């Protein structure tokens, strides 16, 4: 991968993840207790041998920038020409903010050119999966492709969420349609499925640059790889598909777009099963992150009716389950669940404090929230809608606004990420 430059797109507003993205960029949202969403893609880069990466940021990037600086910039060898660097919009070639995925790469065309890569690997910072990009690169080189895009098989009913790829049994891409309502296309590898783009592309640099320059001059373009770049390249360039190979090495392929609150909730709760498909404990494919120093988690009190327990849960360092019960949950660092409280099927971000005699289920609790004694969340949807954000499937999201108004003295709302 020494000839390859990674460009990781992390500038999306994450509107479908609101209110979790009200104060942070989507790739900076917590995942799996101790991680940020962007850690998954960055770990794939490092594990694949890709050690030159630009991260393109834009919206509410303070906590994301800090996380990258503190946790990732130091693990590559600068003296070897390796780097993981953040590139905010610099308006060097345009007066606009990033207007689309292709425009984001175009606006950093000078930074890309300065590294003189032979190949550019374009990635998204908000998906959950394990993938060895080097395998994709080998196919790209062996096939003599100008562009290779990673694909995964999906049900035809899901096409409105994906770029649909017309691919033959030799992996040639003969068509690309972004998020069609329906399609008659079927994958040659499984006639009941459709080949869909994963938003992962390898371009020869000498192909990418002129294509971006041409797109930038088109006033009718959305400046997006899926909507504009790839459909226009079909038939003119050699485009191949790479079938996703999951480094989890389980029977089912695991790739999740956590772009909605329900999808985000489900992906986190996947982790608490006995043998989750997405394996955080694989030493051969470690998931890295930046961790602050906390004491070990502990579970205290063993009295009748007051026993500190956590069952089928991910519990991070610094957590104290003090006479409460936690079931089927993901707890980020420094969470406290106090006596006689029950927390079920929920995600609690860092520094959440659950008071006594609380009952919480199917909820996402943002960081620094203090839940007052006796509070009930997740049991009455209509009541919850009056105070919190509730998804169509009934997941309740409690943000820091709740603590700001309910308990302004005990919570520092302005604590940094």
UniProtKB/Swiss-Prot annotation:
Catalytic activity annotation: alpha-D-glucose 1-phosphate + ATP + H(+) = ADP-alpha-D-glucose + diphosphate
Quaternary structure note: Homotetramer.
CDD domains recorded: ADP_Glucose_PP, LbH_G1P_AT_C
NCBIfam families for this protein: glgC, PRK00725.1, PRK00844.1
Record bears the keyword S-adenosyl-L-methionine: no
Pathway: Glycan biosynthesis; glycogen biosynthesis
InterPro entries: ADP-Glc_PPase, ADP_Glu_pyroP_CS, GlgC_bac, GlmU/GlgC-like_hexapep, NTP_transferase_dom, Nucleotide-diphossugar_trans, Trimer_LpxA-like_sf
Signal peptide (residue range): none
Residues involved in alpha-D-glucose 1-phosphate binding: 98, 163, 178-179, 197
Transmembrane segments: none
Family indicated by similarity: Belongs to the bacterial/plant glucose-1-phosphate adenylyltransferase family.
One Pfam family per UniProt: NTP_transferase
Organism, scientific name: Koribacter versatilis (strain Ellin345)
Function: Involved in the biosynthesis of ADP-glucose, a building block required for the elongation reactions to produce glycogen. Catalyzes the reaction between ATP and alpha-D-glucose 1-phosphate (G1P) to produce pyrophosphate and ADP-Glc.
HAMAP family named in the record: GlgC (MF_00624)
GO molecular function: ATP binding; glucose-1-phosphate adenylyltransferase activity
Keyword field: ATP-binding, Carbohydrate metabolism, Glycogen biosynthesis, Glycogen metabolism, Nucleotide-binding, Nucleotidyltransferase, Transferase
Top-level lineage group: Bacteria
Keyword check for Phosphoprotein: no
UniProt name for this protein: Glucose-1-phosphate adenylyltransferase
Protein's GO biological process: glycogen biosynthetic process
Entry's EC annotation: 2.7.7.27
């Amino acid at each position: 991968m020494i000839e390859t430059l990674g460009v990781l797109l992390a500038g999306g507003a994450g509107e479908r993840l609101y209110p979790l993205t009200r104060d942070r960029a989507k790739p900076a949202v917590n995942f799996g207790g101790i991680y940020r969403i962007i850690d998954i893609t960055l770990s794939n880069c490092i594990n694949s041998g890709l050690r030159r990466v630009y991260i393109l940021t834009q919206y509410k990037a303070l906590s994301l920038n800090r996380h990258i600086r503190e946790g990732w910039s130091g693990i590559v060898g600068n003296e070897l020409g390796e780097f993981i660097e953040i590139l905010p919009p610099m308006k060097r070639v345009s007066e606009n903010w990033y207007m689309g995925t292709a425009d984001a790469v175009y606006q950093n065309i000078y930074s890309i050119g300065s590294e003189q890569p032979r190949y550019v690997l374009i990635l998204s910072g908000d998906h959950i999966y394990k993938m060895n990009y080097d395998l994709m690169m080998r196919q790209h080189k062996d096939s003599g492709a100008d562009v290779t895009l990673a694909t995964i098989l999906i049900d035809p009913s899901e096409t409105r969420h994906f770029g649909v790829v017309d691919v033959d049994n030799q992996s040639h891409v003969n068509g690309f349609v972004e998020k069609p309502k329906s399609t008659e296309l079927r994958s040659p590898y499984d006639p009941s499925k459709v080949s869909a783009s994963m938003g992962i592309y390898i371009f020869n640099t000498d192909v990418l640059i002129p294509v971006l320059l041409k797109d930038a001059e088109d006033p009718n373009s959305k400046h997006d790889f899926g909507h504009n770049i790839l459909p226009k390249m079909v038939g003119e360039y050699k485009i191949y598909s790479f079938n996703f190979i999951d480094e989890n090495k389980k029977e089912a392929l695991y790739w999740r777009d956590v772009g909605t609150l329900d999808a985000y909730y489900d992906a986190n709760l996947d982790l608490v099963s006995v043998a989750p498909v997405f394996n955080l404990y694989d030493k051969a494919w470690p998931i890295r992150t930046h961790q602050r120093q906390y004491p070990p988690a502990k579970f205290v009190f063993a009295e009748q009716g007051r026993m500190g327990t956590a069952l089928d849960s991910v519990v991070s360092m610094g957590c104290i389950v003090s006479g409460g019960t936690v079931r089927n949950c993901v707890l980020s660092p420094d969470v406290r669940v106090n006596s006689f409280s029950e927390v079920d099927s929920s995600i609690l971000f860092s520094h959440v404090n659950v008071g006594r005699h609380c009952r919480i289920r199917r909820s996402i609790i943002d960081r620094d929230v203090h839940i007052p004694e006796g509070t009930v969340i997740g049991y009455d949807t209509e009541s919850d809608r009056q105070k919190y954000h509730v998804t169509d499937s009934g997941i309740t999201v409690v943000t820091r606004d709740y603590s700001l108004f309910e308990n302004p003295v005990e919570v520092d709302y302005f604590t940094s990420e």
